[in-house]
Amino acid sequence: MKPSVSSYSFQQLISSGEITQFEAIALAAEIGFEGIEFTDLRPNNKKDATLEEQLEFARALREEAKRCGIAIVSYTIGADLYKGSDEADAAEVKRVMDQVKVAAELGAPTMRHDVCYKAVIGDRTVGFDRMLPTIAKNARAITEFAATLGVRTCSENHGKIAQDSDRVERLYYAVDHENYGLLVDMGNFACADEDSALAVSRVAPYAIHVHVKDFVKIPFGKEAPEGLKTFSTRAQNLLAGCAIGDGDIPVAQCLAILKAAGYDGYVSIEFEGSKPCLDELRLGISRLKAMIG
């Protein structure tokens, strides 16, 4: 396994305007990461960039990564593959396919897209099982297109709907395409109140990319320490992002499970805490390297 980092880990500095995604590359290399992945590309922190602007930015990022001696290992975007109508679904599939072109321009071997964010469409509760056939059909169309560009696609346990290990496993088999796999985020299972080690043991065989993430867990009814940035799980417990090894996610065990399943690719730290990100990433990579050997 090789240590990598998500550009989202630098979001404190990107949001404040101190750096852009471009400058995150040199920072990641300086800290000691061997790979970096990018979330939705925003040239010069521009949120509404056109596809052509993103493609041009992707080329610049690829050259900068080459200069810094660091690999671009994945590209991550949001997506909703169940919009409630054929027309809306088709438009979203087209948009995601355009983002596959960005991944290819980056030189990223994998691209992660979300699949859904909500189980209520209009005034109707839909539910995951009812959405699954449509989501799988759309994800299959995307991965078939991505295969022509040499990019593997994957979905992550993310978004609180398609987040449990049994759901993402069912999604994997419903898509049923050799170019499609899972991005296994060991921390995100806690967002659905699932034990991370058990969840990872279920989905490890399907992993084509991995996020390493740690959270402090705060049970429902307990107050979070002052100054700690938290968010609610599906069952209304609280989580707070932290450096790898400072929380309650069994990171070392999850990595061991993945290794036993044959995973030997990049493992990307995705830091979501409130402490200064550079300090936490330096601490995190030292611990991660010790865990992966």
Give the role of each language-model region.
Residues K2-S4, G35, A71-T76, A108-R112, ...:
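Structural preference for beta-strand elements that scaffold enzyme active sites
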Residues S16-A28, A90-K101, A192-V200, V251-C254:
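Short, acidic/polar
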Residues G35-I36, A136-D248, A290:
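Acidic/histidine-rich catalytic cores of soluble enzymes
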Residues Y8-F10, T39-L41, I77-D80, C116-K118, ...:
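Active-site beta-loop-alpha junctions enriched in small/polar residues
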Residues V5, A28, I36, A65, ...:
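Conserved, mostly hydrophobic/aromatic
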Residues R59-A71, Y82-L182, C191, R202:
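Active-site acidic/histidine proton-transfer and metal-coordination neighborhood
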Residues E37-L61, C116-I121:
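Glycine-rich, proline-tolerant flexible connector loops at the mouths of alpha/beta enzymes
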Residues F22-L41, G107:
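Catalytic domains of carbohydrate-active enzymes, especially glycoside hydrolases
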